[in-house]
Amino acid sequence: GLIFENHIIKALRKIDPEAQLAHLAYHNSIEAPSCVKPEEGIFLEFAPFFRTWDQPLKNRDAVGRDGKTTHGEFLRMLEDNLKVFPAETAQVLDYWMDDSLYSGWKKPQVQVPWHRDVFLSDLETYASYGIRNITAYAIYVDDYYVKTFGDISFVDDYGQGLLNYRAK
């Protein structure tokens, strides 16, 4: 992936010298690159897709949704990636509110199993690595969701968590 991304960023920077491109550390590409170094303008986007969201990342023994990868292993992969990519430009893409995921990519969707304490703990964990940029999906949280479940307070929790978020 990084070889291809390096070619893309070189082409983009011919048009826009300030162009940025994410290296998506996700699923099969979550291990840190070891042979290829990123070109200027490539930043880390860490997306621990197979983690579990009923326990915080700091619970290193928690086993992810794949039944084998622990949160400790996800954190090790994050640490390894941060040896290649600077924390200052790194971004986390997490799935705390991704109802498409929780619903198995089928509608009608289920209610988001929101764990505010897990979310806030995860923010602290990411902050401890110096990561300043946090994003999340909220797919399937739509008009049907609001009509069916009513409570979308997790969106406010997410916003307040980010408002108060500070990288360390």
Where are these regions (language model features)?
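Catalytic-core regions of glycoside hydrolase
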Residues: G1-A167
